[in-house]
Amino acid sequence: MRRAVLWDSSAILALLDADDADHGRAVAAAHHIVAERRPSFVTNYIEAEAHALLLRKLGRAIARQWLLTGGLPVLRVLPEEEERAKAILATHADKDWSLCDVISFAVLESRGARMAFTFDRHFRQYGRFEILGLLP
C-alpha cells in the first residue's frame, strides 16, 4: 500500500469541476498518478463527503454518476482507525480539522500509504504525507 494514493474530496471536486480554481492542477496530478500506475483509493468517509460536496457544487446528476461509477476503490475505515483519528483531534486542539480529515490521516498511517491527492491545506498542516495537488 506504500505506493497507493488517497484521493481527498477536494481533489475529486477540482477534477470534475472545470470552473474550479484548482482544476488544471487536478488534471495534471491525476495524469501523474495514472502515468505512475499508482493504486488509488478513497475511504468510505471521503466517499460520503465527496458525494455531498458534488451534490452541493455540481448538482445531483453529477453527484449520483460519480457515486455509482466513480471508479475508485472504497477502503472501509476500521474501528481502530476511527479511535486513532479521535486521538489525533485530541492532541491537535488548535486545528480546525474535520473528522474526515483526521480519519484520512489515521488510514494513511495505519495502512502505510504515504501520498494524498488533495487541495486541503489541513493535510500539509499535519505534515506526514507527500501531497499531490497543493502548491508548496
Q: Can you say where each PLM-predicted feature lies in the sequence?
A:
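Metal-dependent nucleic-acid phosphoesterase active-site entry motif
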Residues: M1-D20
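PIN-domain endoribonuclease scaffold, especially VapC-family toxins
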Residues: M1-V5, G24-D96, A106, S110-R114, ...
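Conserved glycosyltransferase catalytic-site signature
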Residues: S9, D101-V102
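Catalytic P-loop NTPase motifs of RecA-like helicase/translocase cores
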Residues: L13, Q125-Y126
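Short beta-strand and adjacent tight-turn residues that come in two discontinuous sequence segments
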Residues: T118
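Short, ordered loop/turn segments at secondary-structure junctions
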Residues: R121
